[in-house]
Amino acid sequence: MSQFKRQRINPLPGGRNFSGTASTSLLGPPPGLLTPPVATELSQNARHLQGGEKQRVFTGIVTSLHDYFGVVDEEVFFQLSVVKGRLPQLGEKVLVKAAYNPGQAVPWNAVKVQTLSNQPLLKSPAPPLLHVAALGQKQGILGAQPQLIFQPHRIPPLFPQKPLSLFQTSHTLHLSHLNRFPARGPHGRLDQGQSDDYDSKKRKQRAGGEPWGAKKPRHDLPPYRVHLTPYTVDSPICDFLELQRRYRSLLVPSDFLSVHLSWLSAFPLSQPFSLHHPSRIQVSSEKEAAPDAGAEPIPADSDPAYSSKVLLLSSPGLEELYRCCMLFVDDMAEPRETPEHPLKQIKFLLGRKEEEAVLVGGEWSPSLDGLDPQADPQVLVRTAIRCAQAQTGIDLSGCTKWWRFAEFQYLQPGPPRRLQTVVVYLPDVWTIMPTLEEWEALCQQKAAEAAPPTQEAPGETEPTEQAPDALEQAADTSRQNAETPEATTQQETDTDLPEAPPPPLEPAVIARPGCVNLSLHGIVEDRRPKERISFEVMVLAELFLEMLQRDFGYRVYKMLLSLPEKVVSPPEPEKEEAAKEEEAIKEEVVKEPKDEAQNEGPATESEAPLKEDGLLPKPPSSGGEEEEKPRGEASEDLCEMALDPELLLLRDDGEEEFAGAKLEDSEVRSVASNQSEMEFSSLQDMPKELDPSAVLPLDCLLAFVFFDANWCGYLHRRDLERILLTLGIRLSAEQAKQLVSRVVTQNICQYRSLQYSRQEGLDGGLPEEVLFGNLDLLPPSGKSTKPGAAPTEHKALVSHNGSLINVGSLLQRAEQQDSGRLYLENRIHTLELKLEESHNRFSATEVTNKTLAAEMQELRARLAEAEETARTAERQKSQLQRLLQELRRRLTPLQLEIQRVVEKADSWVEKEEPAPSN
């Protein structure tokens, strides 16, 4: 809401000024900028929308509501005059049709807003709004009359379309080609719930007036979106108009002349830029001491005619990117957490200037760097090294390659007009990365420096001094404190929280605290970036993204060339005749049961059994069996549609438009069952016509993942064709269509279900004229015949110590050895992590074993005591038994004697009783 407050106080020069008289209110006149527009402005907005502005239709929640306007999802502004039907309440779910206009202060403005009717009544009443009475609602003594939410017949339709058009937002096929908009940035989102709401209404109306209940929770799939530019990425120069055409939301400075794309010659198609080497750059915290600067930041004789800047790349390396892609492919059965996209892992180290993220670099100094930067290319390299050392603390003098990435030209006004040139280099930062031994030594040094302040807890400092890195610290704490495996993990997390964060496990270059690391996704795709980004950073991020698009697209092109073509065998006439005869016989046999079923009544017709796969039985066709049909005709058989609750067959008969997304005739939606609950598993069940023996390299998987912005797992045919057409190798539309058909099934390429392995590229056996498309057929340009080919030199032989050395071959060999070394280092690092984990588990198991052994000794002692007690009790028992037997033996004669005495006493009593009577 801060942006709306700023809008009231200081309207931007590009903001829209609403005209017309404002309706008075009890609170006074409304804000002038937020006055409802008149009819003429609405018609102008409609003309703007027809002129190519971006639109999107989505469902959102009303997060803010005021007297004259509201906000949906804290980013889409809507006037209350565009609300159709009942006014929404705060927190309600609404259907929004919004338009994007970068010239306004608030770029996203709603054109239509409608409250959804399939949501429960809100507990809290709506806030009192002053415009309720003005909109025609009658008020009584107790206030406004309450309205029921569930009144769908009173709400006018927002998009009057046929019912079938609502089903095109399938969860299995998101056919919203959101990348067709030329402006860079978020391309909108498609409403995923409208078709399901319509579906559930129809089912419950047919079911006989069942109460409207809550829908079952289900897994919402991300919308389909690709990273793709709508133009060919081979233009060597971009002027002011070209930049505005490519990037409409970019603010170009007024003194800008042109930018030369030097990366086209530095990284041709035959030698693309490689992400194989990991180059991690980390910004140190404010507490750590910054490294000393090597030179003064601004020399006295600096000349703005030439400036040198560097693009410091921070990348995890190709192995880490492969690992994320393989995690995505391996989680097909049980999708868990979505891995991070490559665009979010590729980052750039930028400096700060007046709260703005800028490139690292500065102006040329003749006294420090050299005299002639135009003749000597090392002059600007020295400038870049000096400025990078002063601004970031990173010494780039150890970099072996300096690629000229782009060259900006500005016009300095004044009586002597001057041309200012800014050269941007891309150095190989991975060559100055510390080795594992150096990194471990640095971590030990930092651990030793951090140990003295933490002397209050001696039990915690001992493992810190002994451990060389964070893993050994965790192992020592687990040995000391853990008693069971579960307690081990809990105590490790508890003890790590109050301590200082451990150093990263992977080697990295440490930069000064004033710098910032921004990902490529955050610069290009983020609508509301946290950092203010300069013009040059935005352009370079777009150019770097276009370079990656060309390189990954070329990998897809080479992969398609290596795959065999699909052979479609036409049906034989003899088999067709035999199939016709069999079907005629079947029709005659089936006629009699059908007649009997019709006599029984219409109830039996609706009880026809379904097949085992859940599909209705198809009527017999005269074209032969289904297996013998070509795939092109198979899509035509999906034209049937049954609106049964257990079946939904969708088909597109022509181009329809919903939410700014066009559907093509060739794009047929897949089959879904289970009461129209579209699931992603139906995509995996599609037939795969790719040769099972064709195993693709991992770089093809990475290329597919790069274009798939939201990890949907598939790419559309149209997007694959456009990827090939934007490479700059001048392919025709028919060539692209034939190549794409090798991996496409039903207009979709399910790259997630293909087979991949760690092997080299597939362009080894392909001829050169095929690799460069149709460039050899076109007339040569002014500079070179093949722009994609590497510039040819006279000879790569250099005389050294009396012998000729092939420098190109040596460089290639060194590159191969470096790649092998990196792979082995990654494997060793992985094994070290596994070994350390096993060591931690072993230590925890040792502690558990010791605890169990102590418990066992205690139990043994208690068992011995119990046995001794049992023996004592047994002895006492036997003794008592003997005493009882002896007492019994002695008491028996005494008992007999007492019995005799009693009998005698009784006899005497009987004798004495009759005497007194005489």
Curated annotation (Swiss-Prot):
Alphabetized GO MF terms: enzyme inhibitor activity; RNA polymerase II complex binding
Sorted UniProt keywords: Acetylation, Activator, Apoptosis, Biological rhythms, Cell cycle, Coiled coil, Cytoplasm, Cytoskeleton, DNA damage, Isopeptide bond, Metalloenzyme inhibitor, Methylation, mRNA processing, mRNA splicing, Nucleus, Phosphoprotein, Repressor, Transcription, Transcription regulation, Tumor suppressor, Ubl conjugation, Wnt signaling pathway
Biased composition range(s): Low complexity: 447-468, 482-492
Modified residues (N6-acetyllysine): K112, K215
CC annotations in GO: chromatin; cytoplasm; DBIRD complex; nucleus; spindle
Localization (cell): Nucleus; Cytoplasm; Cytoplasm, Cytoskeleton, Spindle
Residue span of region Interaction with NR1D1: 699-918
Stretches for region Interaction with MCC: 605-665
Pfam family, any one: S1-like
Disulfide bond sites: none
Coiled-coil annotated spans: 824-904
Ranges for region Disordered: 1-35, 179-219, 446-510, 568-637
Modification after translation, per record: ATM/ATR-mediated phosphorylation at Thr-454 upon DNA damage promotes binding to SIRT1. Phosphorylation at Thr-454 promotes its sumoylation by switching the binding partner of CCAR2 from SENP1 to PIAS3.
Record InterPro entries: BURAN (IPR045354), CCAR1/CCAR2 (IPR025224), DBC1/CARP1_inactive_NUDIX_dom (IPR025954), EF-hand-dom_pair (IPR011992), LAIKA (IPR045353), S1-like_RNA-bd_dom (IPR025223)
SUPFAM superfamilies: EF-hand, Myosin rod fragments
Modified residues (Phosphoserine): S124, S569, S622, S670, S673, S676, S682, S803
Modified residues (N6-methyllysine): K123
GO biological process: apoptotic process; DNA damage response; mRNA processing; negative regulation of cell growth; negative regulation of DNA-templated transcription; negative regulation of intrinsic apoptotic signaling pathway in response to DNA damage; negative regulation of proteasomal ubiquitin-dependent protein catabolic process; positive regulation of apoptotic process
Annotated Basic and acidic residues bias: 572-597
Modified residues (Omega-N-methylarginine): R180
Glycyl lysine isopeptide (Lys-Gly) (interchain with G-Cter in SUMO2) crosslink residues: K586
Chain residue numbers at which the record places covalent cross-link Glycyl lysine isopeptide (Lys-Gly) (interchain with G-Cter in SUMO2 and SUMO3): K586
Residue(s) carrying Phosphothreonine: T35, T454, T484, T892
Function description: Core component of the DBIRD complex, a multiprotein complex that acts at the interface between core mRNP particles and RNA polymerase II (RNAPII) and integrates transcript elongation with the regulation of alternative splicing: the DBIRD complex affects local transcript elongation rates and alternative splicing of a large set of exons embedded in (A + T)-rich DNA regions. Inhibits SIRT1 deacetylase activity leading to increasing levels of p53/TP53 acetylation and p53-mediated apoptosis. Inhibits SUV39H1 methyltransferase activity.
PANTHER family the UniProt entry points to: CELL CYCLE AND APOPTOSIS REGULATOR PROTEIN 2 (PTHR14304:SF12), CELL DIVISION CYCLE AND APOPTOSIS REGULATOR PROTEIN (PTHR14304)
Name this polypeptide is given: Cell cycle and apoptosis regulator protein 2
The organism of origin for this protein: Pongo abelii
Gene behind this protein: CCAR2
